[in-house]
Amino acid sequence: MKVIFAGTPDFAAAALRAVAAAGFEIPLVLTQPDRPKGRGMQLTAPPVKQAALELGLRVEQPEKLRNNAEALQMLKEVEADVMVVAAYGLILPQEVLDTPKHGCLNIHASLLPRWRGAAPIQRAIEAGDAETGVCIMQMDIGLDTGDVVSEHRYAIQPTDTANEVHDALMEIGAAAVVADLQQLQSKGRLNAVKQPEEGVTYAQKLSKEEARIDWSKSAAVIERKIRAFNPVPAAWVEYQGKPMKIRRAEVVAQQGAAGEVLSCSADGLVVACGENALKITELQPAGGRRMNIAAFAAGRHIEAGAKL
């Protein structure tokens, strides 16, 4: 069975490796163009391209698929049975969705219809969801509105960051899409179920502006945001006129004026919130490295009563 693969980041690269390891023929891999990255802004190949080259696969990097006759012709010439799409980042027009014999399967990191859109992992943590998961979806022209082929649940742990949930769902998604491809190969079709009309939510893209901590919120709400925005864009506060990223914290039952520092020690930097307080245990000063609070407190001291 011929499988076109389309994806860009690590989440997708894991799925590509799994599909290849399962023995499926992959005549073509699509990924986004190389982009400048890092402090030196060095042109860097996306993880899917790196994986594809290691696997000896053909890679193409079109800027767009909409109104791109050359790309459409390339896809048609492959005569693929199905396309697997995972965090590709380009919009697939209807003529592309219709090109493979069995259409396009998407690996989506939420339990649809909850958290359709760009940042499902982060929004699930931020909202305090007890669980999330992966859906393998038969793509249509809408935003994550296609019929669901399979659903795989994951219990969000109380200390899970977006990075940790991402890595768990990456492995779940890779295994899930292989299982569904194997079913398609053996049975010639997949049983897909329409998404329910109730329970639809949208996972808006994250912004640096919303990552700024609002101390008037409850400590529980802020703690979830810190985990949801870890590692990027990272929740932050202003400290000495510069943004300081907050990497890990925990809720403590203390009270004070919102934003007031209650204590600063090797055990934690405790800041009052709208309800309860937050004990910060890991942070990253502007231009510095991530550090635990003991390392931070050894070189700096924030007086009780100071405002963040």
UniProtKB/Swiss-Prot annotation:
EC number in record: 2.1.2.9
Domain of life: Bacteria
Pfam families with a match to the protein in the record: Formyl_trans_C, Formyl_trans_N
Binding positions ((6S)-5,6,7,8-tetrahydrofolate): S110, L111, L112, P113
A GO term for molecular function: methionyl-tRNA formyltransferase activity
InterPro entries: Fmt, Formyl_trans_C, Formyl_transf_N, Formyl_transf_N_sf, Formyl_transferase-like_C_sf, GART_AS, Met-tRNA-FMT_C, Met-tRNA-FMT_N
UniProt record similarity statement: Belongs to the Fmt family.
The protein, known as: Methionyl-tRNA formyltransferase
Species, as recorded: Neisseria meningitidis serogroup B (strain ATCC BAA-335 / MC58)
Lineage: Bacteria, Pseudomonadati, Pseudomonadota, Betaproteobacteria, Neisseriales
Gene name tied to this protein: fmt
